[in-house]
Amino acid sequence: VEQICDEAGYTRGAFYSNFESKDELCAAILHDRHDAVIAATRTTADAMPATFTSSSDAADAAVDRYLALQRVDARWPVVSAELRLHALRSQEFRPTYLSWHEEIREQVVQIFSLALEQRGLHLPVPVPQAIDLMEGVSEVASFSAKLRGMPADTETAANLKAMLAALLGVAG
């Protein structure tokens, strides 16, 4: 509990005065993260130009905008891993985590699908699969950078841009 509080930016006192269990703390962290992800995704999609000169330009613009809106604490990759591990270990917390992840995924898929449709863009894979691929790329890049003591944004951005440009380019 102390490590999760510390990594998530909560004090130990805040935990004891606001949460009755580790699961409640974890659910609150997930709720806060949900709102940030959906807001950044929606704002990014709404701000994207109607046309692009290349799939690389489209990917660069989308990823830069999204990451600028997502400026999360550098500790988030560790917090995220801790939350997933807690869900794996805790039968009680697992449904909360799975519900949160599915809800975010569904909303991101809807926003991303609409943005692609409005711009006449298509992917070579279903949008949910593309979202999973980008989530995996982002996670690996974040952890790799973190392990090497580097800021995660640079590597994450480069890898996400490459993945999205490849998906858009193959479909284009």
Residue ranges and their predicted role:
Residues 15, 30, 74, 83:
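Aromatic/pi-system hotspot detector in well-structured domains
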Residues 38, 71-81, 91-118, 129, ...:
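Amphipathic alpha-helical packing segments from all-alpha helical-bundle domains
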Residues 31-37:
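Short, basic, alpha-helical segments at the C-terminal edge of helix-turn-helix-like DNA-binding modules
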Residues 94-98, 116-167, 171-172:
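Hydrophobic/aromatic-rich alpha-helical bundle segments in the mid-to-C-terminal region
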Residues 21, 86-91:
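Short loop-to-helix capping motifs
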Residues 48, 84-88, 141, 145-149:
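Secondary-structure edge/capping motif, primarily at the C-terminal ends of alpha-helices
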